Amino acid sequence: MAAGSRTSLLLAFALLCLPWLQEAGAVQTVPLSRLFKEAMLQAHRAHQLAIDTYQEFISSWGMEAYITKEQKYSFLHDSQTSFCFSDSIPTSSNMEETQQKSNLELLHISLLLIESRLEPVRFLRSTFTNNLVYDTSDSDDYHLLKDLEEGIQMLMGRLEDGSHLTGQTLKQTYSKFDTNSHNHDALLKNYGLLHCFRKDMDKVETFLRMVQCRSVEGSCGF
């Protein structure tokens, strides 16, 4: 290849990559404390979304009276019926075990939980017959989790210590919510999915808070 052609190709490649390089450089200049602040804000909003959605579903369909305590326990804790894929992730069962995990491990688990929710959350609102409680749409819910996913990825990039995480990846994703709300099985399915959504987002917010206090604040009040 002629020298002039090679130079032209290199110049074209550099111009194509320039926006990405500028963006990557910009991320590196953002204070770590600010990245954590934004991620924690998104995580709190996602957790609150999960709580509000679960509570409205319970209230709208009278699920507390609809399902006995025995049925609820069996449905949520029986591995044959549980909808919580996060139960298959090698995570911690208590705060002491959580504190023993590295920052990257906690961020990695949080990322898996978020990614497992991206597709089904698109159809979250269609589960309900009354959306007046909410001022957000399916699209807003999706972009909330998408922003949180990107924020966690940025944090992982900034905290990368040269080690490579190996182990389980959560290739499974949660199924869509069932809009056939008058069907008994559909009600149970949606109940389980929303319970797990609340449980998973609580984990994400807790894990991010722990990584934040280790990385930025220097002390943890857990």
Curated annotation (Swiss-Prot):
Secretion signal, residue range per the UniProt entry: 1-26
GO MF, one example: metal ion binding
Key word Transit peptide present: no
Family matches, as PROSITE patterns: SOMATOTROPIN_2
Pfam families named among the record's database cross-references: Hormone_1
S-S bridge residues: 213-220
Residues given in the record as Zn(2+) binding sites: 44, 205
Keyword hit for Disulfide bond: yes
Key words, A-Z: Disulfide bond, Hormone, Metal-binding, Secreted, Signal, Zinc
Entries under InterPro entries matching the protein: 4_helix_cytokine-like_core, Somatotropin, Somatotropin/Prolactin, Somatotropin_CS
A Gene Ontology cellular-component term: vesicle
SUPFAM superfamilies: 4-helical cytokines
GO BP of this protein: animal organ development; growth hormone receptor signaling pathway; positive regulation of receptor signaling pathway via JAK-STAT; response to nutrient levels
Entry's localization field: Secreted
Domain of life: Eukaryota
Function: May be a novel gestational hormone required to compensate for absence of other members of the GH/CS cluster during gestation.
PANTHER family (alphabetical): CHORIONIC SOMATOMAMMOTROPIN HORMONE 1-RELATED (PTHR11417:SF67), SOMATOTROPIN,PROLACTIN (PTHR11417)
The family this protein is said to belong to: Belongs to the somatotropin/prolactin family.
Name this polypeptide is given: Chorionic somatomammotropin hormone-like 1
